[in-house]
Swiss-Prot record:
Belongs to the class-II fumarase/aspartase family. Fumarase subfamily. Keywords: Cytoplasm, Lyase, Tricarboxylic acid cycle. This is Fumarate hydratase class II. The gene is fumC. Pathway: Carbohydrate metabolism; tricarboxylic acid cycle; (S)-malate from fumarate: step 1/1. The active site is at H188, S318. Involved in the TCA cycle. Catalyzes the stereospecific interconversion of fumarate to L-malate. The record marks E331 as: Important for catalytic activity.
Amino acid sequence: MTATRTETDTFGPIEVQADRYWGAQAQRSLGNFKIGWEKQPASVVRALGIVKQAAARANMALAGLDPKVGDAIIAAAQEVIDGKLTEHFPLVVWQTGSGTQSNMNANEVISNRAIEMLGGEMGTKKPVHPNDHVNMSQSSNDTYPTAMHIACVEEIVHHLLPALKHLHTALEAKVKQFEKIIKIGRTHTQDATPLTLGQEFSGYAAQVASAIANIELTLPALSKLAQGGTAVGTGLNAPVGFAEKVAEEISEITGLSFVTAPNKFEALASHDSMVFSHGAINAAAAALFKIANDIRFLGSGPRAGLGELSLPENEPGSSIMPGKVNPTQSEALTQVCAHIFGNNAALSFAGSQGHFELNVYNPMMAYNFLQSVQLLGDAAVSFTDNCVVGIEAREDNIRKGVENSLMLVTALNGKLGYDICAKIAKTAHKNGTTLREEAVGGGYLTNEEFDQYVRPENMIGPK
């Protein structure tokens, strides 16, 4: 039989597995919310540890927290930050919308670990109380939103942005590699005028660069913290200067710039900065979806498709068709992007649900946001390393496309006019002939004139 200890809260005693640091409220949550498999993200757990450590420092400086107790809280919180106590955070996302159970999970774990460090008995709440000491000057209503913002900023800065920059670097390398390869452009999926393959890839690189810049643009708003607003934004039970001190301590702990939100009522009741930031992530997903689609279609074939690109062959593609290889990295990335579009819809709705002084969709917002960051970062790296860096041009196919294109007739607009050029192109298409044959045979140009005007290399920029 598993050994237990008795923990208590305002509802009375409850048994908790003896080797677990959580207490009564986390235990009740395990029983009350048996919903799904989605646990609190590790980045949120880490962020809760950061908040508790920063609050302990601020409380020792401003609220008279006993240094012995405060130092023990700081030490225990550091273990949470370092991921040493992650197994003691078992709660699911689907709980109270304020994240109260997860805040109390952190309070209880840090309390019991600090008690253990001080030689006390877990479950006694002495000498470190989860509410009176670990949660001192705080409410779940400002603590969980603060942890959300910390986690989101850290994951964007340390995971998503480096991944997108990695992809951007690889695309820029392809721009250089393909700069002299002239191909036919396509608009409305139909043949258009020429451009270089490098120019086409420069569009992809520019999209990723814009995505990076747009996400970075959202970080200042996301770096404003609710901590210090306590229950409804008034700062009740927090000392003067607590909000500013906590933001300062969080900045020191993370090495990132955080500030206290100028209006705590807004910080508790709305999460517009989360919606704004995820909107930029959603736009990045839209950009990567387009890029992945273009690349897989340009690589279609190998004999009956567009066949302009040769994509890396990473694994067998079919259980029934021998030798088949598929554009799996594009498929994985576009699935991720589609999922992010769904997350964005959920976040947008959740952001609108700040009823009066508190938004109560916090855990779901944090989970979806962080999932998007994780997935897009992972997928961008996978797509870069397993696809983009190995892309090669199939120059023979590209050349044939240029030679057969009817849209080269656009180069004759200035010489012959739109209507005659349209007639030449349509006649060539109908007869299965070339532009040269119809232009020269129809008496519009000589062979020499055709060669003078229809030069793809002169059609890839302003003249």
